[in-house]
Amino acid sequence: GQWNVDGLWQPQVDGEKISCFYGMFERSDGAKFLENYELGSNATLFSPQGGLRASASDLASILRLLANEGALNGRKILKRSSVETLLSPAWSLNAAGNNGRTSGEAQPGGARDGLMTSYGLSVHRIDMRAWGFVDGPATLLGHVGRAYGVFSFALFDPDSRDGIAMIVTGVADDPFKAPGHSPLTRLEETVLHWWINH
């Protein structure tokens, strides 16, 4: 239907029409994926990208682990070299911009272009100035998550080791129709601006 910023919540996956993301096209046979599904057999079909189900507290623990070079609550869990490998760039967009797609899984040429310009081992390496953030850290490391009406991120400043974990549900049907100054939604930008300024 028509986007209405003040409108009611619109079901995306738990309504009568299931609309899971299986590529950059709308499927008319979305319910077909459920035909052979047995409860409890494999939740992958219903899991977020990457399969991580975590609370904001869990995400904050992961950030503390990475920011503290593999230690959490006084216990060494990962070697420092392992954390360095995770956070180091495995890929970066070249100056010509022709060695990858920066929109992630979104349609190229849209508001999400520039989302990924440097990537570690499943870690976004974000140039905050390129995203239009004039204040705060120049770089953030972490991950942005989306699944079934959930918007989330877990990001930290590698210099100060300060971080933020955010999980928001119940957003309106299409928050991408009013893009901000970055590849994020305005909701995500607003939370980051709040964090930077507090």
Regions found by a protein language model. Give the residues of each.
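Short, surface-exposed loop or secondary-structure junction motifs
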Residues: 1-140
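Short, well-ordered loop/turn and helix-capping segments at boundaries between secondary-structure elements
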Residues: 68, 72, 92, 169-173, ...
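A short acidic/glycine-rich loop-to-helix N-cap element
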Residues: 170-186
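C-terminal accessory segments of extracellular proteins
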Residues: 181-197
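Short, well-ordered beta-strand elements
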Residues: 143, 151-157, 161-175
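Active-site beta-strand/loop architecture of penicillin-binding DD-peptidases
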Residues: 137, 149-152
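Short intrinsically disordered coil segments
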Residues: 137-144, 182
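Extracellular/periplasmic catalytic domains that process cell-envelope and extracellular macromolecules
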Residues: 54, 114-117, 147-148, 156-160
